[in-house]
Amino acid sequence: MFRRGDNSNFNVQNSFFLPLEYEYTVKDNVPSKKKSSIGFFPLDDSLFTSKNNSGHHKSEQLHRGNAETIRSQFGTDAVPIRIDEKEGKWDRIQDDNSSNLNYQINNSNDPASSGKYTQSIDCNHIAESKFSKKNGNIDSLRSNSATFMLNTADEDVIEFSFDDNVPYAELLSGATLEKCSLTLNEINKKLFNTLYDFRVSKDNPEENLVELILPNCVVLLNFFEDIELLADSSDEAFEKSTFINTIEFIVHDIWVETLIKNINLLQMFDADLKCYNDKYIICKLKGQYPSTNIVDIMCRLKHFSNSILETFKFGIELKEQDQCHNRNTIINYVLFSRVFSTIVLEIQKCFILIVKFMYSVNFLEKFSDEVFLSFIEILIKIVFEHQIPQLFLGIDEIIQLWLKNNEGKRQQLLSAWCNGTVQDMKQSQQRESSNAESESITSSTEEDEEGLQFNKWDVIEPFIDNIKALNQSKSHM
């Protein structure tokens, strides 16, 4: 599904709803001219903390202070720089702890820039975001030093090791690693750090989810496809909790941060939120975060019961009941549904990439079967609620990966899940048929050639049959 691409000029900025089998490019996703414009923003790590995290993992949580250390690259030299956002100062820290102000800050009040505050450092670009770690540097956990060959479009081939200050962001910006040698745990740590550092921080983050997150996940996938895995030593066991929390971080970035940055779309009808049925969404909009645990997020996604058409219908009902006083409220609900569905879709695409990566390095076997089936259930629900049948292509692929090289238990789990899904669909159809209002909406939609809904059973039935056939073929092998 996700293959290497040849088109270095491929632009994925507006490709929210591309079919998932589309061939994403993995080379030069971020042009060199734009590298310097990619920023990072610190997040309060307390938002990531899950109640289910073990005490051992909590001791390894990453913390940020008010001052963030950034390394700027001058050839092979790296100079730490401290950012004090309150005073607008960039202090270059010398070895003798003295400050040598060698920087340039531009405060732009030009109306053409929409009042945006911009900062620029007199250096090539900000290469890496560094942050302190509670129990020492992750590099100290590595048992040996691996060597890479880094190729970029505008630089000569350079050789470096883990001890050098080569930024993770550079590895994600069109660079390809030709050779390396890592243990399984080192891969886990590297992925964790890379995705933690690389954040969406542009003015319109919802337009950059695919542009920044997905291509870099693809780069990671292709990078890890070619690595040589070393056997983990007895004292360096694979840390499942760290990998699961890596996924939580990705979801948190896309889900929470993007939704919060789009809160301006909802301020116009904030008074009408009390009429909105989804309490979880209201909770999110008010800035309350019940949990960032991946399983909790999956479960709460089920409670979003409004497709675009259903949201529009709900707005009309409010109008008829005089609960809203102008048609702008209806339009705002539709706008919010579009933004929300886009965010959800990008989360699902990221999950497909993550699951594919997990399989490529044998992580899929370590992933909880219950979490996996919850993930599949969420994907199917998103297909129905947001009318994205192309997503079935990705669902089918990751199910096949999940079943591969695993006989017995997973086949039984999948068979039981399919039977339960079919039963739920039949019960749902019976409820819809007994509801006169639902019947009228369905009939009117079927008459409209441009209707937003499709017959759910016509889609899910062959899909379930496909899975059952696949399941049977696996069980007979």
Curated annotation (Swiss-Prot):
Region (Disordered): 428-452
Any one GO CC term of the record: cytoplasm
Coiled coil (UniProt feature): none
Major subcellular location class: cytoplasm
Alphabetically ordered keywords of this record: Cytoplasm, Sporulation
Compositional bias annotation for Low complexity: 432-444
Name of the protein in question: Sporulation-specific protein 77
Organism: Saccharomyces cerevisiae (strain ATCC 204508 / S288c)
Gene: SPO77
